[in-house]
């Protein structure tokens, strides 16, 4: 046991890593929660069962590539219905999408007080809780995460034709996702068995 740690005491390794990287000059931009409805069962009886993991968005500079539109979420049906109901010109959001500022003509009512569906927003900025269930993987790597998780990160953080680096490549989920999105990838893995798994799973490339 690490010196200074107590039995049953959370060490907080994800946050320790995030703070260490920030101290090294990185910018900690977001703490994203990966929420799972089908998490790994736990036998604990003196605390809640864990059903999430942290994903930290870290950058090397204040300005960086981030494609918010590529991972935008569809707006809820109730939100769309409220837009279609229309608002009077005196409403505080008459010419504004809440949270996005003024947009020319986007919310101005037409005759009868309804919005033009062609101008109505259909998506919103992605939130920082991502509900992505785990998926079964029959290979020998027990901690493989779902491709959709990697795909979301790649779409937001890597332009088309860019290169994705995974320094803990494991069974190659990141490479699989990158290849499916027409990105190149570099995977680093110490375990030779995992390298073999990744190569067979991806089916080619530079793994």
Identify the role of each PLM range:
Residues 1-207:
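Core catalytic lobe of class I
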